[in-house]
C-alpha cells in the first residue's frame, strides 16, 4: 500500500522530463483491492530459477502455491534475455557533470564511483547496438503478456550476503542483481514482496511483474498476497 501511495504522488506527465510518459494516471490505491481471481500468471523458470539457494527454492514454491489459489491459472513461460547491457552507459551520462568536477566526484562512495566509471569508455556504436537489442527484447516481452497477465520470479537467487562476503562487491552485486536487472531492460513494472525466511532467519522475496503501464495489476496481486500471508508484518527483534 505504501508503494501505491508513493507512486500516486509521483506519477504523471512532466514536459520537462524526456523520459516522462504522456498517459493517464490510474487510481493506484483503489487498484490494491482489484479482484485477482481472473489473473493469468506466468512463472519464468528458465534462468530466474537456476542455481537457487535451497531455502529460496522452498519458500518460492510455497509462495507460488498461495498465488495459485489467488489467481485463475499458473503456467510456465519463457522470457527473452538481453544479450547486452546499456546500464553502465546511462548512469554515467546522468552523473557525468558531477564526475568531471573533482570536488563533487570526491563525494561519491568508492564502490559506486567504480561502477559508474565503467560506462565512461563504451563506444557509441556499442551503445547503439545495445539499444537496438533492448528494443527487440522489449517487443518480445510484449508477446509474453498476450498469454499471461503477470510474471512471477524469485527476487534473488542467493540469500543476503554477510559483511565478509560483501568485501568482494562485484561478485556480490552481480549475484544479487541477477534476477532484477533483466526487468530494467524489459522496461516493465516490477515489485518485490516478502515471502518468507531462510532457516537462519534471512529474508526472501518474490517478484511480481506486469506489462508496460501495468502497475495496477502488479499492485493488486502484491496486495492480495500480503493479505493472504503475514510476512510483511514480521520484524527482527532489536532487543
Task: Label every model-predicted segment.
Residues 1-58, 228-239:
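A short helix-breaking turn/cap at a secondary-structure junction
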Residues 4, 66, 122-239:
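Glycine-rich, small-residue loops and helix-cap segments
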Residues 4-8, 29, 61, 92, ...:
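Predominant activation on well-ordered alpha-helical scaffold segments within soluble catalytic domains
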Residues 10, 45-48, 79-83, 156-158:
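Glycine-rich beta-alpha junction loops
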Residues 27-30, 52-78, 96-105, 127-148:
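Acyltransferase
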Residues 33-44, 85-142, 192-205:
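Short helix-loop capping/hinge segments that flank enzyme active sites or metal/cofactor-binding pockets
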Residues 54-56, 83-93, 162-168:
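Short glycine/threonine-rich loop-to-helix capping motif typified by GTGT followed
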Residues 76-81, 187:
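Catalytic beta-strand/loop signature of glycosyltransferases that borders the donor
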